[in-house]
Amino acid sequence: MKEMVDYGIIGFLIFLSVIVIAIAIERLWFFATLRVDDYTDRRKLELALHKRLTLVATIGSNAPYIGLLGTVMGIMLTFMDLGSASGIDTKAIMTNLALALKATGMGLLVAIPAIVIYNLLVRKSEILVTKWDIFHHPVDTQSHEIYSKA
């Protein structure tokens, strides 16, 4: 049972980290090949830019909880083993508790880069939308100078 919890939680967190990496690579490739002047509607551009970013944010915000779930389950199994054993083996208890805590560490190891990646991708999206605005609504320098003198 302990191995199932351990491998299940850690395996799921590794799977989530692979998803985040795949989305990051796909988005960076999309951003690199994007031409903002190909879009005539800002809303369509924003939809294209924000594709799959919600999934990255969801993984980043929930990975610590998944790791915590693994820790809680590991601690519960340790207490069950402790309750069913006739003697107290301090070494086994400490080893099991340490192994249970690695799930929380793994959750944080997935969450922190996922949130950083999400923030970088959102910022890049904002920059591209601003470039679209500049391309489609250039500032008339003469009228801008007239209004700034008034």
From Swiss-Prot:
<dbReference type="InterPro" id="IPR014172">
    <property type="entry name" value="TonB_ExbB_2"/>
</dbReference>
<dbReference type="Pfam" id="PF01618">
    <property type="entry name" value="MotA_ExbB"/>
</dbReference>
<comment type="similarity">
    <text>Belongs to the ExbB/TolQ family.</text>
</comment>
<keyword id="KW-1003">Cell membrane</keyword>
<keyword id="KW-1133">Transmembrane helix</keyword>
<dbReference type="GO" id="GO:0017038">
    <property type="term" value="P:protein import"/>
</dbReference>
<dbReference type="GO" id="GO:0005886">
    <property type="term" value="C:plasma membrane"/>
</dbReference>
<keyword id="KW-0472">Membrane</keyword>
<dbReference type="InterPro" id="IPR050790">
    <property type="entry name" value="ExbB/TolQ_transport"/>
</dbReference>
<keyword id="KW-0997">Cell inner membrane</keyword>
<feature type="transmembrane region" description="Helical">
    <location>
        <begin position="5"/>
        <end position="25"/>
    </location>
</feature>
<dbReference type="GO" id="GO:0055085">
    <property type="term" value="P:transmembrane transport"/>
</dbReference>
<keyword id="KW-0812">Transmembrane</keyword>
<protein>
    <recommendedName>
        <fullName>Putative biopolymer transport protein ExbB-like 2</fullName>
    </recommendedName>
</protein>
<dbReference type="InterPro" id="IPR002898">
    <property type="entry name" value="MotA_ExbB_proton_chnl"/>
</dbReference>
<keyword id="KW-0653">Protein transport</keyword>
<keyword id="KW-0813">Transport</keyword>
<feature type="transmembrane region" description="Helical">
    <location>
        <begin position="97"/>
        <end position="117"/>
    </location>
</feature>
<feature type="transmembrane region" description="Helical">
    <location>
        <begin position="63"/>
        <end position="83"/>
    </location>
</feature>
